[in-house]
Amino acid sequence: MTDIKSMTIDELKELMTTLGDKPFRAKQIYSWLHEHLVTSYDEMTNLSKSLREKLKEYPVTALKMVDVQTSRIDGTQKYLFRLSDGNVIESVLMRYKHGNSVCISSQVGCRMGCRFCASTIGGLTRCLLPSEMLDQIYRIQALTGERVSNVVVMGTGEPLDNYENLLRFIHILTEDGGLHISQRNLTVSTCGLVPKIYDLAKEKLQMTLALSLHAPNDVKRRELMPIANKYSMDEVLEACRYYFKETGRRITFEYSLVAGVNDSDEDARELSGRIRDMNCHVNLIPVNPIKERSFVRSTRQAVENFKIKLEKYGINVTIRREMGSDIDGACGQLRKSYMEKTESEK
């Protein structure tokens, strides 16, 4: 099946030629799909009825909302969407003074196996299509009536493990004729797929790369992240340096603090020594507890002390603001709870 919502304007022009219609119709269809966010050809009122009938051979797929949870604390909303094949994914809308940010999933499940993450429990089911990544943003914008200005690809899945679809998603999201979200308002996370970081750098996109570091050395990183058995910290950091060299975009290092594992003064000193020469920013994240893991989040004082130590060594650092802490806010937890409930009801 042709996924029309994943097609570029040039590909739509080719489709128009195939259907015996004018190429300029491609921009009209593209605008309906990606700017006006329609989900039916019948809504494309400037197209002829005959063209709309022909296009119905190429269904416009749309996510269906299964559940939404709203935080009473800050208005953060966590959405559970069903895909056309019955799989479910989750997305998060976070409201800030500077605008609305949506965190999207890039895969159904994840195969990276990071030990503190709920998303990877159960492994990888499949990669998301560009249209399925886009539609998380489109559905949330349509449901709320509020414009999305920032997008973070930090939900379930490893974005660089879905590389080609990710690039197409970015192209459509940031292009004229659609939502036209600035590349500078886009952040993509990775656990450290080194070859793909180099590939992404060569694209020279103006987005932020967020590297999930979570440890000051290889020994501790291997305990937390299986990917560290394949790529050393030196290799990962060198790839990040290359990304900055090619794009001029400062690297963000995500660092989840686990009590007694990676939150000591020595950890802060060692980490700063590894990244002090880099144009970077460290985002400290108190780890979210999940029942399948024994990890305990660092105390508030330990997090603050770690921040102070890094600042002492000249590192730019912030503590991530916790959004939606009264709902299943941790990545993968709403989907996991839903799947467990569905399984128990069988």
Where are these regions (language model features)?
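P-loop NTP-binding catalytic core
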Residues: 85-99
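Short linear Ser/Thr-Pro motifs
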Residues: 71, 105-106, 119, 189, ...
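Auxiliary Fe-S-binding modules of radical SAM enzymes
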Residues: 1-89, 241-250, 255-346
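Conserved alpha-helical substructure of the radical SAM core
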Residues: 120-150
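Canonical Radical SAM [4Fe-4S] cluster-binding loop centered on the CxxxCxxC motif
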Residues: 95-132
